[in-house]
Amino acid sequence: MAAPTHAAPPHAALRPDLNIISEWIAPDSRVLDLGCGDGTLLAHLRDTRQVSGYGLEIDSVNIAKCIRAGVNVIQTDLDAGLSDFDQASFDYVVMTQTLQAVYYPARLLDEMLRVGSEGIVTFPNFGHWRCRMHVALRGRMPVSRTLPEEWYNTPNIHLCTLRDFESLCAKKGIHILQRTVVDYAHHSNFAMSLLPNLLGEIALYRFQRIK
């Protein structure tokens, strides 16, 4: 009897930011997805790029979805670190919309580049002009399309701007290989490329340790 297969989702149906990330990942590579959610990205990479790997997730509902999709998943808290994985176990370590929600983001970046050759992260840009205007004119923490929760019930505890992230990378000897800045609908334009920290709502970075 033939082994069961998992149908690949149509490429157009993939969430736009995950679509961008998938283009950064080489075929036949090993991927660790931190905060993998329902496993959509890993399932897509497995079916379209023959990628192997694992997802780390804390939510039991998402873990069940990963299992149904045939995605290798481990239940864990990212703030506990990645000590279960050896150095250079993966080609890529991915973390989408999670960096700002962990207690120790700087330490986690180090761990990403310990277990992986390259890291990929995405996060909401707190330097976007709407966030700046909200604080300047209302004197309150912003609520926006990319930051929809009030300050008292948000999972985001370490919000940053593009400049903040790039400054941290420079301090840690991390080389940025690619950067894409998009709006809420994951579209980009020429003005955004000129003023990314002011006009970009979501940042996507691919990086590695300076050798």
Residue locations for each model-derived region?
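Class I SAM-dependent methyltransferase "Motif I" SAM/SAH-binding loop
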Residues: 35-37
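Glycine-rich SAM-binding Motif I of class I
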Residues: 39-43
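Class I SAM-dependent methyltransferase SAM/SAH-binding core
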Residues: 44-81
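Class I SAM-dependent methyltransferase Rossmann-like catalytic core
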Residues: 2-13
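Conserved alpha-helix/loop element of class I SAM-dependent methyltransferases that forms part
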Residues: 12-28
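S-adenosyl-L-methionine-dependent methyltransferase catalytic module, highlighting the catalytic core
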Residues: 106-111, 118-211
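Short conserved loop adjoining the S-adenosyl-L-methionine
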Residues: 81-87
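A short SAM/SAH-binding and catalytic strip from SAM-dependent methyltransferases
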Residues: 92-104
